[in-house]
Amino acid sequence: MGLSTLEQKLTEMITAPVEALGYELVGIEFIRGRTSTLRIYIDSEDGINVDDCADVSHQVSAVLDVEDPISVAYNLEVSSPGLDRPMFTADHYARFQGEEVALVLRMAVQNRRKWQGIIKAVDGEMITVTVEGKDEVFALSNIQKANLVPHF
């Protein structure tokens, strides 16, 4: 998935502190608005609880206060990926091969920006998703947003 320059810089800046605490940095989102939000997703083999989120928030806040990479006021949110886990990297798609995913594309493919189907394969920077019985191939750089679709 194509990250913005700011998101790339933030990812580079906070990966080491998050991993030093024993967590995986799943990904980040910076949402601009009246009140901007920096959302950080973390995970671990044992799952994530509120204390884990607080620990990461404290550590990341200290790094961001020193580096000051964001020029606007923002709220920091740290959470687990949840059931509708966001997908950020080729590794995420490979890890959840066989699962259902909802995609929003930056540029339409076949006049559609929204797609939903089963992750079939990952090949470098391309993913294959089976949509209504037909395989569709998408460039990760064209995926604006992707989430697993939970089934209950």
UniProtKB/Swiss-Prot annotation:
Gene Ontology terms: biological process: ribosomal small subunit assembly; translation
Keywords on record: Cytoplasm, Ribosome biogenesis
One annotated Gene Ontology cellular component of this protein: cytosol
UniProt keyword Glycoprotein present: no
Localization per Swiss-Prot or TrEMBL: Cytoplasm
InterPro entries: Ribosome_maturation_RimP (IPR003728), RimP_C (IPR028998), RimP_C_sf (IPR036847), RimP_N (IPR028989), RimP_N_sf (IPR035956)
CDD domains named in the record: YlxS_C (cd01734)
Primary subcellular site in the record, as a coarse category: cytoplasm
PANTHER family: RIBOSOME MATURATION FACTOR RIMP
Family per similarity comment: Belongs to the RimP family.
Physiological role: Required for maturation of 30S ribosomal subunits.
UniProt name for this protein: Ribosome maturation factor RimP
Lineage summary: Bacteria, Pseudomonadati, Pseudomonadota, Gammaproteobacteria, Enterobacterales
Gene: rimP
